[in-house]
């Protein structure tokens, strides 16, 4: 670089420049380039009246790729050949076609070379002529943007003799072909030129320089000591002296590396290295998809000679070759996580580009360039002073139809954007050389600093960053110190709290011991209660079983009773039927008997009739026959009659016997049936009686067992009641804890109240002190005013000392005594009033505290005296007793009463314990109240001490003031005596008084003009020394008559006194009055400061104690005039 600068300086002196091949490869950072005032040689065109040109828009449609062919996606785009300018879009759904017209349309048959010749070749000459040009590719992901702009960057061949000879691949894109063609054109146009390139990447809205090694970036970031480094590359609006802009105003990228290249090979190498660093990733749309925007900028400086003036000047041209990342559908591209975030930011920047295009087409007042860094970088290319062309890449497949339509619409709207291209400012060669020399000096300083190891060169921005970091470190250190101080205070507070905690821990341990005892008892009771509960449960289960058995037995008895009743009814019915049958048989037998009786009676009647007829016939026969035959027949008849009679009798007897047997049989059957039924009933009754006896015995046994179990259950219930008592005890303990917590909170509250009272008392005392100080200050100011007035009166006294000495003395005496008594009275009254107000405040605060404590006691006592636990026990007792009454016999009432008595005793014991706890808490509250009262008494005593101190200070100050005034009065009387001596000496005949100033009038006339002096009508209250001095003054002056109290006129002096004047009889201070020391105030007695103030000035720093300590040094530290200050006892 040093050799380059020397060569440039030699060229400047000789007027010739060497070939560009002699330049070494160099790099420069635009942030370090100085901004100098450059000499503008000329501008080919003025900004006003420049023609406007529309942005040129080219469309390139690729062929279907393998994925689209594999998915059998149809073609919806058709072009019109190599020289076509229209794109025809076919809608497969409706079959309609839409035609888009552009500057040029490249179909499937186009190649890279034709693209370069038709699009970018013309911009190389424009750049050499001094224009800024931009070419950027826009389109969907996977449509060939990177292929169109970069393509295949590898060099197929080169020549060592000619470094600008490069053989490119047929797939090389626009950028490598521009580099090769640029150097070929530059060799033909001029021999003196320079070319520099820059390569920027915009990834996730962050700029990155692709020409900088990653190691350098990591080292720069490491210098920030773990802090987030600032973005090294930033976008600014350039200064108006920028020569790369036609109007001196353009976008300026700070921190970007610009590499000087001497051949196309070096440019291709830089392009290849930067492309390898670019962010790429694989998606469903493309195997190698670009995930960032890149801007490859070529800047040329061409030296030419003005044809008229012969002056050398430099033309600066710039060509921006932009490869945009493709817009994509996240769902279709399959982007996830980081890829999805990248796609979102890419779409955001492209949407902002679309809004900028729409705003430019619509001629909006606001163009949203600053909403994205991409549009900010392309600000001059869109609607600015740059020649711009857009290459829109599209896909012909149907699956990409939406993105294709969007791209064609954007390209169509972009055609309407108009730019006003202008040639950049021309720069003189001398200013360029100066710029290079400054750059060389800067690099020398950096090199020197690196060799001497005195440090490294940093930019102003980094220096400010380091300074801000150092300030931040200092602030953090101050915060750390503050936090350490707070930590120290917190440690002290922590130690105090630790002490309190230890005390509380001791109390807690004592309570823990008591609680352990209670817990042990509660555990035993809990075990006992659990046993009782289990027994109760067993008893309940047993009772339920017995009840179920009884219910079953009752059901069985009911069933058996019903069956027996039915059987008895059936047997009774059977007996009744038998009785009916028997009764019927009896009736039938009776009827038969009656029939037989009737038959026998009829038979008897018949036999009687037969016998009568036979007798009649026999009589008739006998009459007619012979008697012999009659006898034989009669005997035969008698025999036959007897046989018949016997037969009838036997038959009747048989019948009667048969009837009797049948009746007896019926009776026997009836008796047997009755006896069998009775025996059957008796057996059933006996069985039922046996069952009932067994049931009664079982019930008795069960009742006995139940009674025993109930006794046990009563014991268990008594234990449960004891458990309830224990629970109540635990509740009381918890209640005690709550009361203790409440008491502790009340203690804290009262402690806070005491603290607030102390603070209020301190504030009140401070206010009263301030009021006393203000009143003392006002009194002192009043005294000072009176002193000033006294000084004025003294001057008047000096003017009329002879004529008005009596009146002045009496007036001064009365005025000073009144003022002193009034000031002291005011001070004393204000002090007493302040103390009374403090006492009233303290008493009111104490009274309010007592009221609060009494209210607290009133709130606590009902809680402590409440019998709600006893009520709960009573309710439990009644429930248990009701259950026992319902379930058991009256014999259990004695056991219940005993259990109730035990429960009552337990409740009373618990209530007594609760009352004891409440009494303890009352005693603690009383101790707190007593402590508070003692604290209030201490405050009262301190306030009384303060009052006594203030009043004593007032008395001491007043006494010292009175003593000081007595001394001053004595000095005044002595001075008056000396004045009388001088007057007496002047009155003597042979007096010769020498004066320094001649007097024109005679002394007698001057003396005659003086008023006569009179003695005071009321004797002065002076000390013994003052009276002695006054007597000496009377004795030394013959013309002063104490008896008359009147001075006589002085006689005429002897001698000529015209050349003399009497010396003034009043001593006058020969220097300004000194400052009176002001003592400490009451509130700052520990400090050793002393405040001073002038006697004649009313200082605001004079306080109550300033008079107390100043009187001791009054004589030595102050010079007074003869002030008539008198203190009246």
UniProtKB/Swiss-Prot annotation:
Biased composition (Polar residues): 11-21, 28-48
UniProt domain Kinesin motor: residue ranges: 54-417
Coiled-coil annotated residue ranges, if any: 422-513, 681-765, 919-948
Compartment(s) where it occurs, according to its Swiss-Prot or TrEMBL record: Cytoplasm, Cytoskeleton, Spindle
GO (cellular component) term, any one: cytoplasm
Keyword Cell division belongs to the record: yes
Function: Required for assembly of the mitotic spindle. Interacts with spindle microtubules to produce an outwardly directed force acting upon the poles. Following spindle assembly, CIN8 and KIP1 apparently act to oppose a force that draws separated poles back together. This force seems to be mediate by KAR3.
Protein name: Kinesin-like protein KIP1
Organism: Eremothecium gossypii (strain ATCC 10895 / CBS 109.51 / FGSC 9923 / NRRL Y-1056)
Protein's gene: KIP1
